[in-house]
Amino acid sequence: MRNKVFFIAALMAGVAAQPLSAKEGMFTPDQLPEIAADLKATGLEINPETLADLTGFPMGAVVSLGGCSASFVSPQGLVVTNHHCARGSVQYNSTAENNYLENGFLAKAKSEELPAAPGSRVYVTTEISDVTARVREGIDALSPNERYDTVDQRVKDITAECEQDAGYRCLVASFYGGEEYTLIKRLEVKDVRLVYAPADSIGKYGGDIDNWMWPRHTGDFSFYRAYVAPDGTSAEYSEDNVPYRPKHHLKVSAAGLDDGDFVMAAGYPGSTNRYTRLGEVKNTFEWTYPTFVTLLNNWIDTIEEAAPEGSDARVKYESRLAGLNNYEKNLRGQIDGARRVNLVGLRAEREAELDAWIAADPSRSGYGEAIAALDELSEESATAARTNFWYGNVTNPQLLGTAQRLYRLAKEKEKPDAQRESGYQERDMAFFRQGLQALDRRYDASVDKAEWLLFLNGYLAQPAAERVAVFDQ
């Protein structure tokens, strides 16, 4: 599952007190009715069927920020999210003299709320539809390149049709490697304002040592407010805008939790790879994640050295540092967790059972052939990914990356809009401009140069087979 779509993670509170549910894990909402009996037995008190409706209560109160999950918690458009999800907006409004990162921020009235960082959005899901048949029609007979181009164009066409309704941002999400496609229509709230963010001493209490750990005693929350035009339509920032009135909002219970209480987290964490093959799992945990962890630690050290504490440059790069530390801790935890549960060994056992099942009946031989072809493609993909990893990093610094994107934009604009690559269509231009605007407050030449030298040296240290010949010239 590749695109950012709605997932639910179900688990039991009081982990030490009793075993986890057999259905622990990440599920799409439409899968929940299938495990309704287990959910009820585990402690869910509402009808599991209601959790499959993303436009009804309670799921309609859960929204996406385009990279984070959030929820409406008032009829006046108040949105609660994680502190780190709003930290970029806190950083954007901070200076060395007026540092909201250190001091926190509170708007005591709506008139005191601050504009969120450029490009900030609240996406409210309004409609879900299955478009699998339309996307996949006739593609099985096509060559791989034709198949890719056909699917890509159909997805763009479906998205464009959906976005003919002004103020909406649409997404075609792919599931199971292109087996299923779902169209998600979302109201795009463009006027987002910062209401409250705790000081880092609260919002980042415990720092990266406590991050991703349990129990955790961090005030990891912040508040935004969503605004729309007086007629309720999506609009850019304006003093005339009014708070968005959501159809549904959540009420926060003051009762707290007891050991064994049922807990379900609903949101947009991105993707899950439950059916990844053994070779892909091994490549992920033996090369990709360890290599990335090493790079992230060097990257963090480079920024901290080039942007000392208390400098204006450190304020500009605080949000990036927080993101890098967050990601490094996450990857390191995944590596440790995979080793602890013997993930590679368990996956090998599962695949051995599958191989035995296929071998037991000659009529199943087609499955074996398909799996062998898939594994071969996975090996090719892993090799290409290593080259892309180092090349992507060496072109990652902000100034060089911005220059590349501007050049690419100029080339893409030579094409009809419908044929441009995603990210360079007219629907993407607002984000493009806002990204350039945000760069102004998140760029320091000396830090950017230090980052680039780190990436360049890492790239040059790789064998020629893992570098890009054209770039080397």
Go through each PLM region and give its residues.
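Bacterial N-terminal signal peptides that target proteins for export
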Residues: 1-7
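Terminal presequence/propeptide segments associated with secretion/organelle targeting
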Residues: 2, 16-473
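Bacterial N-terminal signal peptides
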Residues: 8-16
